[in-house]
């Protein structure tokens, strides 16, 4: 791996990168940064979470003329969330060079953006619609742009932004450097490369590199009506630090977040129908740890850069395999382990095989925990919390009252009462989740991607679109919920039950199982 100090970047940029805690480049950065510094056009096929913002951002910042008041670089992103995330990262990367970075996007006060544009940003990040709006108002001038980046171009294609992008490209000088990043390479994206780029270099990060090798991937075969109870029990057993639950539709997200809240989990949802202010508020609370479970659609979560996500639950298997890679890419980042669990209805097993072909990794079958196992996991984590308090906390102020209790009650009864207070008993509160049909079975139809092109395999047709860290529900104050944990029983994780796909079926319980250990 190459160190950032070896690329020949401005020393101020290297200082900023080191401040962020990065020393060695990721594969996409190692391949992109030298070409970016040379001014070459390039097409990068890479997923979110591979470090591509720094890959195009570092050469861009290196070439910015600090004395110029012109917009010298433009990044076009499909969503407001991604535009904000990219601008924040560019700000950090350019902190010591003092480059002015601005994000412009819909759903925000345009007059405030106009005032910010008058302060002469040198890098502008924005969504296609809002960039065009500013161009038409003559509040954004692009005649001095030297570097243009199209980020997540395939997603912009899916969202119908290609015409807007072509209009924007005509406003930028022909003599420029253009960098295009896309998870997939459908024909319309290739045509943009042919029409608007000069002999671009192609950089491809292979699927096995994109699938986050540190992510453990499991599937649970479950009927639709049983999904929510299975999700509840998994959350109780595993007690993830931060979790994202993916639903296929906006209605699904609303119902899941409401149902999780009814059962005491600190959960909120995001999807495209929420106001920008609401979406940013939810994301801010999730990043700050005030929300333990974020429920999201694919589009709403695209491009999110949230550290600390330990578990991703695919409540619905995604309609195209690329979306699966994006979903699980929310976890297992920055060298940390993550876990992805996908719920699959019996009629959807063909979809599972196509996802596995895309990721080049076989998912392990997982048996859903029982209510007893979920409760055993709660008790185990409560026990761990007590043990941690005994070894790590200063208990001198409490010993007088503890001795008084011991004079009145048996020590075992006192310990049992503590466990009862800390452990969450199984919550079977009735909830309403509208049942959705499984994805249609396509026996032998082959995989048809977003452009309808045939592929290998049968049974899949892609769509056109795209422990104890929970808050304590039993106590007031700022304490964390003691639920979840290591799982019940003393089983060993790997089971002997084999399904027709082969491989041992993992149990969600088991103190020693690699599946059930509490996330650290």
Curated annotation (Swiss-Prot):
Residues 442-468, 482-496 have a biased composition (Gly residues). Gene3D superfamilies: P-loop containing nucleotide triphosphate hydrolases. Disruption phenotype: Growth rate decreased at 37 and 25 degrees Celsius, completely stopped at 3 degrees Celsius. No motility at 25 or 3 degrees Celsius. Decreased growth in the presence of ethanol. Signal peptide: none annotated. The keyword Ribonucleoprotein does not apply. ATP binds at residues 46-53. Residues 428-439 have a biased composition (Basic and acidic residues). Keywords: ATP-binding, Cytoplasm, Helicase, Hydrolase, Nucleotide-binding, RNA-binding, Stress response. GO terms for molecular function: ATP binding; ATP hydrolysis activity; RNA helicase activity; RNA strand annealing activity. A motif (DEAD box) lies at residues 151-154. Induction: By growth at 3 degrees Celsius, repressed by 6% NaCl. Residues 214-374 form the Helicase C-terminal domain. It catalyses: ATP + H2O = ADP + phosphate + H(+). HAMAP family: DEAD_helicase_CshA. Belongs to the DEAD box helicase family. CshA subfamily. Oligomerizes, may be a member of the RNA degradosome. This is ATP-dependent RNA helicase CshA. The lineage of its organism: Bacteria, Bacillati, Bacillota, Bacilli, Bacillales. The gene is cshA.
